[in-house]
């Protein structure tokens, strides 16, 4: 059924439709006066390359949410196939205080935790915020990048983790 009536789309039908989309999996992390916190997110998107800007959507009911707002900085760590367990941990399987106990964490310019071995990490300052429904859309200026690992990407689709194999790019 195709409908243009926004009231005709229930929250559960919308969530089911969104579950069909394949998305990269990220750990979004922060540290500063509001404390260290992190969560798993798939709602990350490039906004512009001039200046480099990303957006990330965070649920205002998340236990980590206040730390992100108070700190004003975050790092978007894009996960590889080797990080599926971490994705589950940061999605709520373990308490906030235990989420950073595992692998090596570093820091770039903002001080937000950067996951060693991430596919790529975008170190950002939050420059704007928009409330939409249950979430905030955070507009984030990219201040630094961690080295790109070249590993296989971790995706989430159909309510399961999937792996996107690396392919060799062919030159012209």
UniProtKB/Swiss-Prot annotation:
Keywords: Flavoprotein, FMN, NAD, Oxidoreductase. Coiled coil: none annotated. GO terms for biological process: nitrogen utilization; uracil catabolic process. GO terms for molecular function: FMN binding; FMN reductase (NADH) activity; FMN reductase [NAD(P)H] activity; riboflavin reductase (NADPH) activity. InterPro entries: Flavin_Rdtase-like_dom (IPR002563), NADH-dep_flavin_reductase (IPR050268), RutF (IPR019917), Split_barrel_FMN-bd (IPR012349). SUPFAM superfamilies: FMN-binding split barrel. Its EC number is 1.5.1.42. Pfam families: Flavin_Reduct. It catalyses: FMNH2 + NAD(+) = FMN + NADH + 2 H(+). It comes from the Bacteria. Catalyzes the reduction of FMN to FMNH2 which is used to reduce pyrimidine by RutA via the Rut pathway. Belongs to the non-flavoprotein flavin reductase family. RutF subfamily. This is FMN reductase (NADH) RutF 2. It comes from Methylorubrum extorquens (strain CM4 / NCIMB 13688) (Methylobacterium extorquens).
């Amino acid at each position: 059924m195709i409908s243009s009536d926004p009231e005709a789309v229930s929250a559960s039908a919308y969530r089911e439709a969104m579950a069909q989309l394949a998305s990269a999996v990220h750990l979004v992390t922060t540290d500063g006066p509001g404390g260290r916190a992190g969560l798993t997110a798939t709602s990350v998107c490039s906004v512009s390359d001039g200046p480099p800007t990303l957006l990330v959507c965070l649920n205002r009911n998340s236990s980590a949410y206040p730390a992100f707002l108070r700190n004003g900085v975050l790092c978007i760590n894009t996960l590889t196939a080797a990080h599926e367990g971490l994705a589950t941990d940061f999605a709520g399987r373990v308490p906030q205080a235990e989420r950073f106990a595992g692998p090596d964490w570093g820091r770039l310019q903002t001080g937000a935790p950067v996951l060693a071995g991430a596919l790529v990490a975008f170190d950002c300052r939050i420059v704007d915020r928009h409330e939409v429904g249950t979430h905030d859309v955070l507009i984030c200026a990219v201040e630094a990048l961690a080295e790109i690992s070249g590993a296989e990407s971790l995706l989430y689709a159909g309510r399961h983790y999937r792996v996107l194999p690396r392919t060799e790019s062919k030159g012209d």
